[in-house]
């Protein structure tokens, strides 16, 4: 079916009409210890156990971004399922603070929900570094299958809970991709390149292994640094390249697909534990239903942004798939450094599980 919130978000960005639907996806419902599964059957909830309450959700995405669409979709689903008794107010564009500060407020139970990327909060739940392993996937479908693996999600759930956070089913904003002012023709093109990265120690480590002069900068600082010639390139989802106007200061856009930009939503365990079993089930079900809806929106939105970058703003598309062996070479150059830096921080169990699911079990050090 077509959801009202989808049309609202699309109109806010591009006026693009996107189809969405609810389907199976993500981990199973929470264990009975947290949610009484008979408290909700086929979407029929005992609303006598639901209190009227306003919840607060914060994120750093701009209006119309994937995270904003995700938050608004979640809010609509919660309202529908609760018969209007549970209202989620969504605050976008860092109105509640930075990703790190919002996460701290969620841990303190002063903000109810946050939507962000684990890569943006590496010091909050260190195990989320598992998704910083580069060049594992050729397609977004492969990446999503690995990320949604039950054992991977269970390990992350335990890690988030240890930090006072209840993790909900994961989704994503597509791949992060590199843009540059010089054409990429092979792995040697990266030697000596000054490239903006996230302020993420694991990604900085493996970008450095590629020969890149990794330069961590906040998103708001990228345009000026490129304009002044301080950087040769940067990496972000295509939508961020468009949203920040980087087409003015970058010539080439690629499908490097070096990491999936995983998205996560979580709640403080203090607030979670105060909810009734029905309220918890409503929230979990809404979060799980968001997964396929957000993925479909992401795919449409990111592809639309790429076409705009190429056709309207004249960026030149460099297809990594047409450069023989490029991703494989970059994977080999970065694997050991990435593996050692990540497992040095979080141990090897969770990363080994992801690598096995992704088809790289034979590359795991023995």
Which residues fall in each region the model found?
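A gly/proline- and charged-residue-enriched helix-loop-helix capping module
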Residues: 141-157
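Bacterial N-terminal signal peptides that target proteins for export
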Residues: 1-9
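C-terminal motif of bacterial Sec signal peptides marking the signal peptidase cleavage site
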Residues: 17-21
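N-terminal secretory/targeting leader peptides
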Residues: 23-141, 160-366
């Amino acid at each position: 079916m077509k959801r009202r919130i989808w049309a609202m978000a699309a109109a806010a960005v591009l006026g693009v009409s996107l189809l969405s639907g609810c389907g199976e996806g993500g981990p199973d419902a929470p264990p009975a210890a947290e949610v009484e599964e008979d408290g909700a059957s086929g979407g029929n909830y005992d609303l006598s156990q639901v209190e009227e309450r306003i919840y607060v959700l914060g994120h750093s995405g701009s209006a119309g971004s994937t995270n904003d669409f995700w938050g608004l979709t979640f809010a609509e689903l919660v309202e529908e399922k609760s018969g209007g008794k549970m209202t989620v107010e969504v605050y976008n564009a860092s109105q509640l603070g930075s990703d790190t500060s919002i996460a701290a407020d969620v841990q303190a139970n002063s903000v109810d929900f946050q939507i962000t990327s684990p890569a943006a909060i590496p010091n909050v739940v260190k195990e989320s570094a598992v998704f910083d392993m580069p060049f594992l996937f050729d397609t977004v479908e492969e990446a999503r299958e690995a990320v949604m693996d039950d054992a991977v999600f269970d390990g992350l759930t335990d890690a988030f809970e240890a930090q006072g956070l209840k993790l909900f089913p994961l989704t994503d904003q597509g791949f992060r991709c590199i843009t540059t002012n010089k054409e990429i023709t092979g792995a040697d093109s990266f030697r000596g390149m000054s490239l903006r990265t996230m302020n993420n120690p694991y990604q900085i480590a493996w970008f450095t292994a590629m020969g890149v002069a990794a330069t961590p900068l906040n998103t708001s600082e990228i345009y000026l640094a490129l304009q002044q010639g301080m950087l040769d390139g940067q990496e972000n989802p295509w939508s961020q390249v468009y949203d920040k106007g980087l087409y003015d200061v970058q010539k080439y856009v690629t499908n490097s697909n070096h990491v999936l930009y995983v998205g996560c939503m979580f709640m403080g365990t203090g607030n979670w534990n105060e909810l009734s079993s029905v309220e918890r089930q409503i929230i979990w079900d809404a979060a799980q239903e968001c997964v396929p809806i957000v993925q479909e929106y992401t795919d449409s939105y990111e592809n639309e942004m790429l076409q705009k970058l190429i056709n309207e703003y004249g960026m030149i598309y460099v297809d990594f798939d047409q450069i023989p062996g490029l991703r494989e070479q970059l994977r080999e150059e970065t694997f050991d450094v990435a593996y050692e830096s990540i497992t040095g921080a979080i141990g090897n169990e969770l990363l080994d599980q992801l690598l096995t699911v992704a088809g790289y079990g034979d590359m795991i050090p023995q």
